[in-house]
Amino acid sequence: MGVNKIMYKGKRIKLIWEKVPDCLGIFDPNVNTLLIDPKLKPSTMAKIIFHELWHVICYFNKTNINLIGEEKTALLSEQYAVILKNNPKLKRLLYKCLKRKK
């Protein structure tokens, strides 16, 4: 898949592309590992990546995701993929804004 790590707040999260039983992706904070099923459709994969990144963000910001709930986490975090898919100009603008300067 090309991406094998994610950096967040000075922490390295190892990204492993493999099927996990009974889920599409999972973040394990005990070993800073994110597993994602590589055989997902691209639109589903984007939603799962945003969803799991939300788990990463909550964990490293000491936010109890159980208070938010898995259903709300899914509903809200996965909408980034929907917005970006339906707004290519916005996606390009964000990419330009985040692009590293040489």
Task: Describe the residue ranges of each PLM region.
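Active-site recognition of the HExxH zinc-binding catalytic motif
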Residues: 47-59
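Metalloprotease/metallohydrolase-associated module, dominated by Zn2+-dependent proteases
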Residues: 1-44, 60-102
